Amino acid sequence: MLTLRKSADRGFADHGWLKSHHSFSFAGYYDPAHMGWGNLRVINEDRIAPGTGFGTHGHRDMEIISYVLQGELAHKDTLGNVVGIPPGDVQRMSAGSGVRHSEFNHAPAETTHFLQIWIEPDVTGIAPSYEQKTFAAADKRGRLQLVASPGGAEGAVTIHADARVYVGLFDGAESATLALAEGRKAYVHLVRGQIRANGQPMQAGDALLLDGECRIDLTAGRDAEVLVFDLAP
């Protein structure tokens, strides 16, 4: 089964300092048909205005991944991490038994544009932890680079969930195929540009939901940046 969901069908919230598109039900946006996909619970595409951000707030029992597309995200948490997250970095925070953090855009003029992703963990109540890694554009060019996985396979950040997250950059004749094990779900989110996923034309912000498929084929990219999720059913 293939289901294409257009960018304009996502939830949207404009808080002035924050503009956010919600792929799944989140905060004031509720759609019972879009509560998540497999163990993928949240994809928020956020744009934070200069000099603003999320004040200190808490999370529990969630694998939280941030992927910055433009600008820099300043992160501070109760684990003692005070870091900047630039474009191309993948940040993973396992909330576990509880963690508090803030996220700000300290730039005087540039908007911070990033994706915040939540994946439900396999186990609850674990000790919270933090990890951040850089993935160069060359590693993602014309292929799917694994950036988050159980056990941190292939240099990815480690998540405590039965899920694998890939990022790829595609243009022209570049293409990639990802095999899916029987019974898996998958989710393709196009960050920018254009691409075809299993023959379906996609524009920036579109998503393709897969259930019962044996592979993902990515072709015909035009300045495309794409995230692919291999998920527990």
Give the label of every model feature segment.
Residues 1-233:
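Jelly-roll (double-stranded beta-helix
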